Amino acid sequence: FKCMSEWYW
């Protein structure tokens, strides 16, 4: 899922 604007985990 999206955590911030550009990175994911």
UniProtKB/Swiss-Prot annotation:
<comment type="function">
    <text>Potently induces platelet aggregation of washed human platelet and platelet-rich plasma in a concentration-dependent manner. It acts by binding to GPVI (GP6), leading to kinases-dependent exposure of functional alpha-IIb/beta-3 and platelet aggregation, and also induces metalloproteinase-dependent GP6 shedding from platelets.</text>
</comment>
<keyword id="KW-1199">Hemostasis impairing toxin</keyword>
<keyword id="KW-1202">Platelet aggregation activating toxin</keyword>
<protein>
    <recommendedName>
        <fullName>Snaclec trowaglerix subunit alpha</fullName>
    </recommendedName>
</protein>
<keyword id="KW-0800">Toxin</keyword>
<dbReference type="GO" id="GO:0005576">
    <property type="term" value="C:extracellular region"/>
</dbReference>
<keyword id="KW-1015">Disulfide bond</keyword>
<comment type="subunit">
    <text>Hexamer of heterodimers of subunits alpha and beta (alphabeta)(6); disulfide-linked.</text>
</comment>
<keyword id="KW-0964">Secreted</keyword>
<dbReference type="GO" id="GO:0090729">
    <property type="term" value="F:toxin activity"/>
</dbReference>
<comment type="similarity">
    <text>Belongs to the snaclec family.</text>
</comment>
